Amino acid sequence: MAGPLTVPWMPPHDPGTPALSVVDMHTGGEPLRIVLAGCPEVVGPTLLAKRRYMRQHLDHVRRRLMFEPRGHRDMYGAVLVPSELPDAHLGVLFLNNEGYSSMCGHAVLALGRFALDFGLVPAPPSDAQEALVNIHCPCGLVAAFVECEGCRSRGPVRFHSVPAFVLATDFLVDVPGRGKVVVDIAYGGAFYAFVSAEKLGLDVCSAKMGDLVAAASAVTEAVKAQFKISHPDSEDLAFLYGTILTDGKDTYNEEPTTNICVFADEQVDRSPTGSGVTARIALQYHKGLLELNQTRAFKSSATGSVFTGKAVREAKCGDFKAVIVEVSGQAHYTGTASFIVEDDDPLRDGFLLK
């Protein structure tokens, strides 16, 4: 029997296109592909300017890493960039199957571990139980707290969100083929529409995923057409990211409440959705269903994975009353890879099946 195969060289590829080296992680089942090397410089004086530059000039990097054959329609990614904020340890641009997210909680939880393990933050004191990682996301600065032993991460990570607020409650939206549906719209670094799956004739815990995706996508498109999203800080943040279908259990309870998030181009989050948990906590606090520092558990109907969240203090976002939300979850490493492009590959920039 032949021994293990060793490959000391890269496969044939376009010498003018550097290999894209990545570390893969997941948080509650939701993937995160972190670019280590091979991405051209992302130019811009601010993080939001860098986001615009990448969309306009480097979108082939996103497509190559997120799309098939190197990824899949539910792949998620992160490109690390310098931040203009003095307190930030790193800046990040989030990649999805449609474009560029403003916030991603599952990615922040993973990046907290990654930043500590890969030496992107100062080494914590030898007796420290947690390391602070300040991550500049497109929505703002997010503080992640990473359980550690020396310079290595261990256990769960938690983060404190940007100010989260409610944009609308009980908004009546006409969903084609499904009638009039009442939704809430809240912001947790990204805007989501929230609706109980029961109002759409579905059980979020047992319905077929295709049915949940179709229903959530219909709500998203209807809200986009019938409600004007605005954000007090930047028009770059003023868009509906997706719809979160819930089990309707918004009143405080020690038992987990279940939801599923469908975002971008019908992309399904395998985790409970960190920015969605943030927005849902803000919504429950706004409605008087939750007090400060009351912890709720949120379960993904896709994988059963659980995040916890709580409102830790009140804040403001423009004229909106807001809260800072703490979200906790566990991220894991899954591997490393180097992706290449051959110059005669007609599918070099990837494709998606729908």
From Swiss-Prot:
Pfam families assigned to the protein according to its UniProt record, in alphabetical order: Pro_racemase
InterPro entries, per the entry: Pro_racemase_fam
Reactions the enzyme catalyzes: trans-3-hydroxy-L-proline = 1-pyrroline-2-carboxylate + H2O
GO molecular function: hydro-lyase activity; trans-L-3-hydroxyproline dehydratase activity
Function text: Catalyzes the dehydration of trans-3-hydroxy-L-proline to Delta(1)-pyrroline-2-carboxylate (Pyr2C).
More details: In contrast to the T.cruzi proline racemase enzyme, lacks the conserved Cys at position 273 which is replaced by a Thr residue, transforming the racemase activity into dehydratase activity.
Protein name: Trans-L-3-hydroxyproline dehydratase
Source organism of this protein record: Bos taurus (Bovine)
Gene of this entry: L3HYPDH
